[in-house]
Amino acid sequence: MTLNANWSYPTAIRFGAGRISEIADACFVAGIKKPLLVTDRGLAGMEITQKTLNLLDDAGLGRAIFADVDPNPNEKNAAAGVAAYKAGKHDGVVAFGGGSGLDLGKVVAFLAGQTRPIWDFEDIGDWWTRAKSDAIAPIVAVPTTAGTGSEVGRASVITNSITKQKKIIFHPKFLPTVVICDPELTVGMPKFITAGTGLDAFAHCVEAYCSPHYHPMSQGIALEVM
């Protein structure tokens, strides 16, 4: 069966082969006229990334890219991304890639309008309320692997470059406005990454199914995926 469908849970998701062709429309829906595509170094020069940039450019949205992203993104990557965002006078982010690109893209969109340091927004208590919610830029997310689920998450994992500890940066508006899930973007992955991200997705579903916080829709989705 070939699935091509739209749904919201609660993020608006466009799923189907070839739907990366809708990237410009997704930006328009999100209110983005001058996006910064954030991805990792490995993906930056790949055909799928260049195709996406071409689609944006053809629609008059430019082809700006930031790819100074480590496998475990840190606050230095975030600061550099925010600097690129401001220098280019962008008004939104296309977070593109696996967990690294998605997490950092979300953080760049979040921090671009903030004045406090990133660690002031760690997922502790109500620290997320410190943020200027109206200053958070819109996000369109495009996952290129099956595993992380960051495209539908309200947080990003950022590594402290000094302590080497991973921290969760949280805000409800980390949720992208639109997600494009195009299976064709995953075809070129190495076998071990395909296997690893598939198991990652499976593990997320096991966790959701076994959670003591019962949610019938989450249980149904978890069972279907497993």
Task: Describe each region flagged by the PLM.
Residues I13-S21, M46, Q50, E75, ...:
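Electropositive phosphate-/nucleotide-binding environments in soluble metabolic enzymes
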Residues A155-M226:
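Carboxylate- and glycine-rich phosphate/diphosphate-binding segment that chelates Mg2+/Mn2+
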Residues S21, S100, A146-T148, V187, ...:
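Glycine-rich nucleotide phosphate-binding loop and flanking beta-alpha elements
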